[in-house]
Amino acid sequence: MRTFALFIATALAEIVGCYLPYLWLKQGRSAWLLVPAAASLALFAWLLTLHETAAGRVYAAYGGVYIGVALLWLWIVDGIRPTAWDVAGVAVALTGMGLIMFQPR
């Protein structure tokens, strides 16, 4: 459960770090948004180091959780409800994440 929670926190840090520059570039918001964006991306990188598994495996498995969190962001922040296809894609990605992270060692 700790691994999954850490992946969720990591995904949120990455999404915020990328969303804030999007607001600046696409919606004309303040360039000052780049300061918390940089901090959020630094947090993202640091959170990835907290996993006890090899870095490549962590990055591969993290992708599955990122997809799920990104679709929640789509729904909550952007106000767009994910489709059944989106949900199926997340299920496949999370299955892959589980296979990678929780394999017998």
Swiss-Prot record:
Its main location: membrane. It comes from the Bacteria. Keywords: Cell inner membrane, Cell membrane, Membrane, Transmembrane, Transmembrane helix. SUPFAM superfamilies: Multidrug resistance efflux transporter EmrE (SSF103481). Belongs to the UPF0060 family. Signal peptide: none annotated. This is UPF0060 membrane protein Ajs_1326.
